[in-house]
Amino acid sequence: MSADTAAPAALTADAAVVGAGPAGLAAALELARAGLDVLLLDEQAEPGGQYYRRPGPEVLDAVGDHRPEGGRLVARVRAAGVRVLSGHTVWGVDDDRRTLLAASPGGAAVRVRARWVVAATGAYERSVPFPGWQLPGVVTPGLAQHMSAEGVRLGRRAVVAGSGPFLLPVACALLERGVRVVAVAEAGRPYTPGPASLGALRFPARLAELASYAARLARHGVRVHQDTVVARAHGADRVEAVTLTRFSDPERVVARHGVDLLCVGYGFRPQADLPRLLGCAVDRDPATGDTVPRLTPTGRSSVPHVYVVGEAAGAAGAPTALARGRAAALDILASSGRAPDRGERRRLAVHLASLAGFTRLTAALYPAPAELVPALARRLPGPTLVCRCECVTADAVRAAAAAEGGSDVPAVKGGTRAGMGLCQARECGPALEALRAGGPGTGTVPARVPLRPLPLAAVLELADTPGEDV
Ligand SMILES: Cc1cc2nc3c(=O)[nH]c(=O)nc-3n(C[C@H](O)[C@H](O)[C@H](O)COP(=O)(O)OP(=O)(O)OC[C@H]3O[C@@H](n4cnc5c(N)ncnc54)[C@H](O)[C@@H]3O)c2cc1C
């Protein structure tokens, strides 16, 4: 754990940045360099977030650093004077809708008041239930990627499935760890040439990266099935096999593979709970179905002192996260009278626009989650567990959704306890939203305090930790 983890109970700063991934690090660096007092809080033991995930010293010694540029960025952030609070989970917002409530690594209560709040909380992996998804040996691609990077071999024989460009590098990372990847199953048809894929020619570096993954998979004899999804994972005590079917024709079996590792995920969805608690207006993204904060191009939310950056603003990859973090910081500096270089802001805007072009291309090539997730949820067999924490089946959710008032997601949660367990709907949220009846009412899982499980002592202690005005 970092040395700089101990924090007094009430903290103030010019800017509080929540999340030390690429977006939060970039924002914090820019703000601190301009002379602002910046607090950077992250629940992980080390700063870096998902992309620059910093393994502990033993792992670094054993397998090396697969993204050393992340370590260099963290070092620059520290050198700029940012107060880094690792192991600090922001779990809520006080009644003033301004003071952040956090818990230290030891579970002590910490209040944070800042003139600006930058939410850089990243993304969740998008999971969709299927029969057998609760079996040991079934994991998300992000977890498989992280464990592989840390030298852990999660299985001997794997299938990687779901949708999105992330599946290919994950399959390659597994191969590097000596896992025999028998197949990649992609729900869409992104690798079949068509009018949309012509757009890829405008991004030669990305095309070359894709080609290198494809070549590695081909060398290892990995089949890439398109229009294919996981219908069922089989096994008694852990996953032993997987049945893959056509996405466009669920009755058609594509293959059944014996595996001891199944990695399934449908991309990423923004982690926007903190901005919602801070009162930021949100919209439903028509393409992804995700709840996203309403933002200016520089990440300013409807609450003027709150900015949302990186994947929390919409999944778009690490380079965009870095650029969004900087853009928000420059905007904050401009509004605080420390006018940053105009040319710099213009260059950043152009860079962001070019990155947005690639995000649009990706969205055009892979199936839109707003259609994919409900289609998968509709075909779920009744006894499939949707909420693994509270053991609620698809049939139970459907019955609650069909009852009076069932178009309301909170009513479905209340009637079934789905989404009310330890993970607070982080896993089953998209499926719950997709299974509801539609119609009036709240169609999204609400953001609720606490954002993470925390010791009761951290809440009780709050009464003794008065906030300070900023
Ligand atoms: C599991 C997973 C694995 C991924 N692996 C890759 C990969 O290998 N390659 C790739 O290109 N992309 C990967 N991504 C996508 C990745 O999120 C982005 O490319 C990039 O890391 C986004 O940067 P960010 O700063 O927006 O968010 P992140 O890097 O996700 O950083 C967000 C940080 O916020 C912290 N945080 C969130 N909520 C709180 C809270 N309430 N209190 C305190 N701290 C909080 C998190 O601990 C995290 O460190 C992965 C995503 C996930 C979810």
Task: Give names to the regions the model predicted.
Residues 2-416, 420-422, 426-470:
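Residues forming the flavin
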